[in-house]
């Protein structure tokens, strides 16, 4: 039984003792931790126990994610059912109900995708310079939390010119993209100065891995390409929680069948311009490639013929971007009587969340 709920607040620093010193996330910027810090800070200000303050941090993280997700859904317009479905994937809420900065990163990712969908599907929307600046600014913030998703800034090049009010739209977009990439390089160099002495992966070395790829590209580039092509297979991990030891494999088929039906219910409802379909597809594939390359360089032993460390949650943003593209590929519109209502999408997602909660609790208590 934990004594944290009886433990009062203190400024005294103590050593880790027998606990594991696992400070391995300090290369992320502070923005991803604002909700958690705010919740814990309120508990500390009110002189609540450490346990209550700890859970306040988690609750504030969930609230922050829900707010960001609601904004993304609102922005998505005709694609709001798909965005709702993705935003309510249990993995999102599991991450949000912790101190993980992924909740803010994912919420921001969905907002950026929602902005893009609004720009290309809203007939009344006219893209102005301020819209481009906002989009680029959000991508800069995202770089500090989910670096591979910096490639979302490339979607600016795939907004039809007729949707804009800018005389030199593509020139301005290109300048913004270059600026974001320059910041990305700066941020990457800055984070490489962080040295986590107590957290080292045996055999992994970025410089050594790059040398291997350059010296024998015909050996190692296919390894990365293979991982990119197999990325879909990692989506089953969206229902594997904890330390990848709490699986819901027994109910995966009906859950994914429901998601498929909801997706196809939106066929014909969403119509992205052809150039936007091409752009979203290219950017999605590039993000998958950058994720695979990043993990191969940083998480995989030098010379290994398999990319290690890949988890399905890394592709949540890609899923949110790809689903509207899939629906745009089909011309035939689904009859109204065969469509799902917004209420049904939310209700079914809540049922899946409830199943996840029951499964997790039952497994944890069974282990105890």
Predicted regions and their residues:
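Membrane-lumen/periplasm interface segments of multi-pass, membrane-embedded glycan/lipid transferases
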Residues: 185-269
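Transmembrane-helix signature of polytopic, membrane-embedded enzymes
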Residues: 48-51, 70-90
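Interfacial juxtamembrane loops and adjacent helix segments
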Residues: 1-56
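Membrane-interface alpha helices of multi-pass inner-membrane proteins
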Residues: 94, 128-147, 152-158
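Specific aromatic-rich, kink-prone transmembrane helix
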Residues: 71, 106-124, 135-138, 325
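Membrane-interface helix-loop-helix junctions at transmembrane boundaries of multi-pass membrane enzymes
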Residues: 164-171, 262-286
């Amino acid at each position: 039984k934990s004594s944290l709920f009886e433990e009062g607040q203190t400024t005294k620093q103590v050593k880790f003792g027998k606990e594991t010193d696992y400070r391995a996330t300090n290369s992320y910027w502070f923005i991803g931790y604002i909700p958690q810090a705010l919740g814990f800070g309120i508990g500390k200000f009110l002189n609540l126990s450490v346990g209550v303050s700890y859970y306040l941090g988690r609750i504030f993280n969930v609230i922050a994610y829900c707010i960001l997700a609601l904004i993304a859904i609102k922005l998505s317009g005709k694609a709001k059912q798909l965005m709702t479905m993705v935003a309510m994937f249990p993995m999102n809420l599991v991450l949000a109900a912790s101190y993980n900065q992924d909740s803010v990163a994912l919420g921001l990712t969905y907002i950026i995708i929602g902005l893009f969908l609004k720009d290309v599907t809203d007939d009344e929307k006219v893209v102005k310079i301020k819209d481009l600046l906002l989009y680029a600014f959000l991508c800069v913030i995202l770089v500090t939390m989910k670096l591979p998703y910096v490639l979302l800034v490339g979607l600016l090049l795939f907004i039809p010119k007729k949707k804009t009010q800018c005389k030199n739209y593509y020139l301005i977009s290109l300048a913004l993209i270059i600026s974001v990439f320059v910041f990305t390089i700066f941020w990457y160099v800055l984070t490489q100065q962080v040295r986590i002495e107590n957290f080292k992966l045996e055999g992994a070395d970025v410089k050594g891995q790059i040398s291997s790829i350059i010296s024998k590209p015909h050996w190692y580039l296919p390894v990365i390409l293979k991982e990119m092509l197999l990325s879909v297979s990692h989506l089953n991990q969206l229902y594997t929680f904890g330390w990848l030891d709490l699986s819901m494999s027994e109910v995966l088929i009906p859950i994914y069948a429901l998601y498929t039906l909801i997706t196809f219910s939106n066929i014909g409802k969403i119509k992205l311009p052809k150039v936007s379909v091409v752009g979203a597809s290219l950017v999605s594939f590039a993000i998958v490639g950058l994720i695979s390359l990043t993990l191969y360089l940083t998480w995989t032993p030098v010379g290994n013929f398999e990319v290690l460390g890949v988890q399905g949650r890394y592709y949540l943003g890609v899923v949110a971007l790809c689903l509207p593209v899939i629906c745009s590929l089909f011309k035939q519109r689904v009859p109204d009587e065969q469509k799902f209502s917004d209420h049904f999408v939310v209700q079914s997602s809540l049922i899946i969340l409830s199943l996840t909660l029951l499964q997790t609790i039952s497994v944890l208590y069974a282990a105890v």
